[in-house]
C-alpha cells in the first residue's frame, strides 16, 4: 500500500513509545503524526523530543476519546503497535499472561467505529494471529491450544463489519533493507476503496545483499570488555562517564559469543574483522578471570 495514495487527514499513533513508528510515518508521509498516545511519561517525553509538533496524550489508550481527540477532523491513518510481550513466543511458558494486555488491540476497533480512519495499520509479533482465550488457574494463564486464533478472527471480523477490507502478512525486516532478521505480522485495513498492496522484498538471494548490524555500529566508540569483572566495569564507567555495564555476562551469553566468533571468524573463509578503527579493549581471552 502506498501511503501517498491515502487521503489527507490526521495521522494517529497509538502505543507511541519513543517515536520509532512515528518517525517511519514521517519518512513515508512527510510529516509527523498529529496525535500520539502512550501511558508512560518517559516514553512520551522522548516522543516529544523527536516529534515536538505532535499532540501528545500521557494516558491509557482506552481513556482517550477518539472523537474529542480528533476534534471532528478526518483521520487518514491510524497506526497501532500494541504491547506484544503477552503474545510473543519469546515469553515461552512464563506464567500469568495478562488478559488485559492481550486485549489492547480492541482499542483499534473503538477508533474505527468512532472516527472511521481511512487506513488502519497494526504491527505485532507473528503470534498475534494466534490470539485466543486463556485457560488455566489464576497466576498461570496460558493460551488455549484448541482455540488458537479465535479472538484474532473475531477482531478481524469486527473491522470488516465496520466497512474495512482487511489483510495481514508476515514481513521480515531484513528483506526490506533493515539490519535485523526479525519477522513481524502486519495488518492493513482500509475503507477508502483503494487496494491494499504489499512491498516487494529488496534484499536477499538474487537481490541486494542483506544489511548487517555492523554497518550501524560506530566501532570507534570505546567499549567495556566482555571479560571485565564487576569492579573493572565500574571503573570503566567512571572513566568514560557512562553507566556501569553489567558484568560478568551470563554463561549462556558468553557461550553465544563464543559460537559467533567460531562461526564468523575462526572457521569462516571470509572472517569478519573490524579493522583498525576499533579500539583495543580485550585485556584477556578467557571467559572468566584466571582463564587465558
Label each PLM-derived region with a short phrase:
Residues 7-10:
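Extreme N-terminal starter segment of soluble prokaryotic enzymes
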Residues 1-5:
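Conserved alpha-helix/loop element of class I SAM-dependent methyltransferases that forms part
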Residues 31-33, 55-58, 81, 165, ...:
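A generic, residue-level signal for flexible/boundary positions that often mark functional hotspots
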Residues 18, 82-83:
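Active-site glycine-rich loops that stabilize anionic/oxyanionic intermediates
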Residues 12, 77-80:
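Active-site-proximal beta-strand elements of phosphoester/diester hydrolases
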Residues 12-63:
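SAM cofactor-binding core of SAM-dependent methyltransferases
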Residues 66-77, 84-291:
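Class I S-adenosyl-L-methionine
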